Amino acid sequence: MHVTDCRQSRRPPLTIVFAVLAITVLGAPLVAAQGPIPPNPIFGAVESYDAPDAATLAGVGWTRVQLRWAELQPNGPDDWNPFFFPDPVLDRELADGREVVGLLINTATWAVSEPIAPNGFATPPEGLYLPYDDPGNLWANFVRTVVTRYKGRIRHWIVWNEPDVQHGDDLGLVWAGSVEDYYQLLKVAYLTAKEVDPACQIHLTGTTYWWDHKYGREQWLKRFFDVVAADPAAPAHDYYFDAVTTHIYFKVHTIWDIIHFIKTSMNAHGIDKPIWLAETNAPPSNDPAAVPAEVSFDITQGEQAAFIIQASALALAAGAERIEVYKMVDKSSDSDTDPEPFGLVRQDSSYRPAFHAYQVAARYFRDVRRATRDVWGETAQVTLSEGSRTVTVLWNRVGEPRTVRLAAIAAQATLVEQSGETRTIAARNGTYTLALDPATAWDPHQGGHMIGGPPLVVVENGPVSARGTRRNPTATPTATPTDAPRVTATATPTATPTATDTPTPTATPTNTPTPTATATATPTATPTDTPTPTVTPTATATPTATPISTPTLLPPGTDALHPTGDALWAALGIGVVLAGLRIGLRQRQPPT
C-alpha cells in the first residue's frame, strides 16, 4: 500500500527534509497494532471456542455453536449428552466477553417423521403440527429443554440451517421438508422459546442464495415470506422471528446486492427485521500449510485478508447489524465438511493474514452509528460514522493501480493497512492523496474481480459532517486533466447478483458425536448458466443517506511519493542532525 501526494517523486535534498518532518509525519514508519482488542459485539467468528486465546486477541465479540438435537439427545427425550458442548467451554466464552448464539438443528433419530430423508437428521420431526404445548410435539419439547438449560447464558437462537440447499437426493441437504414445514418449525420454536425466556431472540435460518440461483428456483426466502404473509396470525406474533441470517461467500459485491434483496423481500410484505451476515469468507487456495482438497476459486491469502475488511465494511453499509466470519480455526476433523481452509487461524495455531485483517475490522469498525457506501465504481469508498470519529474504507476494484484524493475531516489521520500496520498521514490542501493497489482476484467465469485490491482504512477524529471543511480557500487547486475519470457516488444497488459460476454450498454435516460443534455447510463452486433472478434489489430498501465526499480519481501515472522512501529519508535526515553534519550536505541516493 502506498500513501501518495501530488509532488514529483524525485527525492528532496536534505536541506528541506527537516522542514517536511516539522509539518507532517507522512513518512513515519509503519507500526503494527499490538495487544488484545476489546470484544466487538458487531463481529463474530464461528466456533471461536476452538481457539479462545486467538479469539480474544482478535476482538471477537460473539460466536455460534451448533446444538444438534441428534447429538444432545441421542437416546430419547430424557437423555442429555453433556460432552457435546461442555458447560466449561460455554462459560469460558462468556467470561472472555463473547456472546454465544445457539443454532438448533438436526432431528434426533428417534424423533423423525415419515418419510425419512436420505440424511435422516434432515427429516421434519414427528408431531410438528401439534400445538406447541402438546407433549406429542417432539420439536417443542426439545426447544423447551435446550432454552431452559441455557437461559441467561444464550439469548439468540437460530432455527435450523440452509434449508435452500436442496437438489434431488443430494446427501448434503439439511432440511428435507417444504417451506411450509419450515415455517411450522419456526413457529413452534418461537412460541416455545418465548414462553421459557421472553427476552430471547429467534433468528430465521441462514440461507445461501446461490443454490436457488443455480437451479433456477424462486428464492427460498421469497417463498418463505409469501407463506408468512398468508398466515393471518403472523402479525400478532411479530411474524414468529426477530432477525434474519444470511451466508455470503467469495464475491464482495454480492454482499450489498443480497442484503438488499433480503430487505426488499421483507419490505414487500410489510416486514422489517435486522439482518445478520452470519457466515462469510473467501478461503485461500495458496496456503502451503493447508492445501485444499477442492478449490472453488483461486484466492490468495492476501486476497482473503482484503475480503474480510471489504465484506465487513460493505455489509455494514448495506444495513447488516452483525457480521460473522466462518470460521475461527482449522481443525483436523474439517476434511469431511470443509474441503477448503476457512480458518483465520491455521491448524498449527499460526495466524493467516486474514486474522490480522479481522483485527483491523474489530479494532476500527466499532460503535458505528451510520454506514454509507459513497463510491462504487473503479474504486470503492465506505464511510463509517462513529459520532466523534470517522472511519473511511477505500479499495480498488479494477486491475490497474488507482490514486484517489479524499477530502479531509481532520488535519491528520491514522492510515491502517490490512496487515494492521499503521502510520500517521497529514492532509495537504484539505485532502489526503492515496494510492490503491490493483485488484487481483479475477473471476474467470463471470469476469471482473471478486475481491478488490488491498484496502486502506483512514481513521480521523471528527464527525463526518466536517468532511472537506479543512480545505484552505486560498490554496492553489491541484491540476487534474479535464478528462480524468471521476468516481460518482451512489447509495443504491447497482448490480444484481449475476447468474454465473458462483459458490454452491455442499452441506455435508456429520452425525459423529463430538465435544465441539461441527461446521455448517461450506461453499464450493459449480459452473452454471442459469438466468438472473427475477427478484432484484430496488431503491426502496436502500439507505437514504446522501452520498458524501466523492474522492477524485487521479489518472494512472500520477507521480506519487512512496511512504517507505519518505521514511528512509526522514530517518537519514534525523541521523544527519544527530551527527552534527551540515544541513547542506550533498544528497545521497537511497539504496535500491
What spans do the regions from the language model cover?
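Ser/Thr-rich, Proline-interspersed low-complexity disordered segments
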Residues: 23, 28-37, 467-558, 562-564
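Boundary/entry segment of secreted carbohydrate-active catalytic domains
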Residues: 33-68
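Substrate-binding cleft and catalytic face of glycoside hydrolase catalytic domains
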Residues: 58-78, 82-240
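Noncatalytic carbohydrate-binding groove/subsite architecture in carbohydrate-active enzymes
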Residues: 179-312, 318
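Aromatic/acidic polysaccharide-binding cleft in carbohydrate-active enzymes
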Residues: 285-358, 373-376
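Carbohydrate-binding surface patches
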Residues: 374-413, 417-420, 461
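C-terminal beta-strand-rich structural cap/linker in extracellular carbohydrate-active enzymes
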Residues: 426-473
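C-terminal membrane-anchoring or membrane-association module
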Residues: 569-592
